[in-house]
Amino acid sequence: MERKYEDMRSCWEFGEASECRRGLMLGMGYTEEELNRPLIAVVNSWNEYNPGHVHLNQLAERVKQGIREAGGLPLEVGTTAICDGMVLKDPKYIEIPSRNLIADQVELTVDGNFFDGMVLLSTCDSIVPGHLMGCARLDIPAIVVTGGYMPLGTFRGKEVVHIRAQDKVGAMAEGKIDPDLYNGLIQHSWGICGGCTSMTTANSMCMMAEAMGMTLPGNSSMSAVSSEIRNLSYRAGLRIMEMVRQGITARQIITPESIRNAIAVDMAVAGSSNLILHLPAIAHEAGYDEPWWKVFDEMSNTVPLLSHLMPGGEYSVKDFDLAGGMPARMKNLLPRLNGDCMTVNGHTVRENVENAVVYNDDVIRTLDNPVMTEPGLGVLYGNLAPEGSIIKIAAVPKQLMHYRGKAKVFNSLHDGLEALRAGQIHEGDACVLRFMGLKGRFGTTAFTFQEELKGKPTLYNSCAIITDGRFSGGTSGLSVGYVSPEAALCSPLSIVEDNDEIEIDIPARSITLCISDEELNARLEKFKWEFSGKDYQRFLRLFSRNVGSMAKGGIWEV
């Protein structure tokens, strides 16, 4: 049954406050007729610094056009939008703190102003999950429009992908690559706008938003510069008005079943390891506090790798788009999905994908023809990670599926990089980078260390990286991250010593510090650590003191 305007949030009366708002809106030039329309927030994370978001102002105009034509009043508001690639060098690292802030911004702006519905525009790593967390928290009609993937660059007559340029960082540092070639790759490997064209966190989160039903079908595999994505933005504006009138809210879309659908798709496409932080956080905001890492682990036993996309594979997101995109991917995965989940367009997952076509069955494979029987991601447990740790299995060299090595321990990313550059890390070492977790240092990424290690093939093909910090969505190699509990919480990771042996068995999903239980407990009793925060600004101190564990999604514990 269609809701009347009188029943909508923006029409609720608050006496003098209502008249004040009415007067202020009229003073800005809005008409009485416009003020009698449903009020729709266009939550636009556009800015001029983030290449994934620099074009969202154009998409927002199309969204607003659709809202107006469908009888609503669109009002554009903003949120923070930090580009992961712009802040990678800063060891403080602010992606996860910014994600939580973005969800808070959505709550305060949209709820405080009594909008009837919202369309949220975002593309990149922390912004898409922040917007989805805000949707789940407020539980009003909402659609997410993701900004599309970045066009491939061209260099010396060939298309190039950014991840291949990043692979050369270590070689350039050691003088093993021609500077002109390197600089040319850096200059031409990124297109004008959109999410970086591999399964980094940006594209991974866009795909998860679609997999859980919060975008219109096909959104996550559209080019940022295509006519299709502008058309979709307009249709999102039309559709949000239908959702407002029908009373369809975010928590009718974001359910335990739809989150499981997203996890299944994540396994099939080897999405970013950062999803193990974001999906549990979104679920929490919707009211579902399940042991989500165990769900990831269970799903890894039933969903193999079906699309071998970069960085671990050979195909770009553009290749994925041309092969049929997300609708085709989900159609072939339907036996592992809940096809009855509702999506924002009013149709079920099954209805949305039933007519999808696969144009390249090597890029989008079926369950009976996987790239590998292992999933994209895996959860490793053991005495070194009692609550779990995450590895991108699809990007691990085959010879490192079973590993045992001696620890080289570093209490910061800076210390690890100095040792690597000084030649103090040797073949087969287990490089332990700790106090980089959410409380220790805001979820610092070990991406820089990993990229420089990649420039030393002998080390890259024999060493392990083990950290309570995170990895970029472009992670590869034997890289175990998100070790939980983190070192700052007096965990087993905090008491690892140089030359301790560490064993990683990926098929068995285990990670083991090879010391006795008695020795481990004795070391833990002696360990003490306290966060001072004196070197950080106020918000980061606030984050460190109030954030929860990696395994629970890094949500506020307040």
Language-model segment annotations:
Residues E95-D104:
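Glycine-rich, highly charged phosphate/nucleotide-binding loops
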Residues V110-H131, I143-T146:
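A short, small-residue-rich loop immediately preceding and capping a beta-strand
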